[in-house]
Amino acid sequence: MSNVLVIQSSILGSYSQSAKLLDNFAVEWKQKHPTDNIVIRDLAAEPLPVLDGEIIAALGGNGELNERQKAAAELSLNLIEEVKTADYVAIAVPMYNFGIPVQLKTWIDLICRAGVTFSYTENGPQGLLVGKKVLVVTTTGGAHRNTATDLALAHIQAVLSLVGLNDISVAYAETLNMGPEAQERGLAEATKAIQAFIAAH
């Protein structure tokens, strides 16, 4: 039995293409692996606290903590534990104004912790969350792949690499706002990549 962590990050609810793609992934994965444990964390439905001075001090373990800081530090460790125990991680990464959703950025801020999920060495940072396979499902309204504006995918890949998640597959659904035919092609391509990931594992 494997553990699968699914991270939803879209704010669009039932209108979200990335959410639909990732929901379909979870359903198809369960059909192939009925005994696997799937944990779904919806960052829009259950928002995380945004990083601020108090929280970053708590994550650094600086001094006596107030109740809010204690809760944030505990939440951070719980989020990290979800990743640690997962064999597979699937993440929805819709592009908003060339970046990632703030909800996803907040999750990143709570799991990227020096000495916990990565360490600094004389050769640079070394990730500590190794040995996992990741599926990134990214959606864009326009055509950005392999261009300077493909910033959402570049961001999440850099962050995942920082913490040791280097085995990354990408399902890319682009041109979703460029007409019905372009949308259909984009979704079909992403669906094919998702199915290939499932078939390979």
Swiss-Prot record:
InterPro entries: Flavodoxin_fold, Flavoprotein-like_sf, FMN-dep_NADH:Q_OxRdtase_AzoR1, NADH:quinone_OxRdtase_FMN_depd. Binds 1 FMN per subunit. Keywords: Flavoprotein, FMN, NAD, Oxidoreductase. Belongs to the azoreductase type 1 family. Its cofactor is FMN. HAMAP family: Azoreductase_type1. Signal peptide: none annotated. GO terms for molecular function: electron transfer activity; FMN binding; oxidoreductase activity, acting on NAD(P)H as acceptor; oxidoreductase activity, acting on NAD(P)H, quinone or similar compound as acceptor. PANTHER family: FMN-DEPENDENT NADH-AZOREDUCTASE 1, FMN-DEPENDENT NADH:QUINONE OXIDOREDUCTASE. It catalyses: 2 a quinone + NADH + H(+) = 2 a 1,4-benzosemiquinone + NAD(+); N,N-dimethyl-1,4-phenylenediamine + anthranilate + 2 NAD(+) = 2-(4-dimethylaminophenyl)diazenylbenzoate + 2 NADH + 2 H(+). It is an enzyme of class 1 (oxidoreductase). This is FMN-dependent NADH:quinone oxidoreductase. FMN binds at S10, S16, Q17, S18, M95, Y96, N97, F98, T139, T140, G141, G142. Homodimer. Its EC number is 1.6.5.-, 1.7.1.17. Quinone reductase that provides resistance to thiol-specific stress caused by electrophilic quinones. The keyword Oxidoreductase applies.
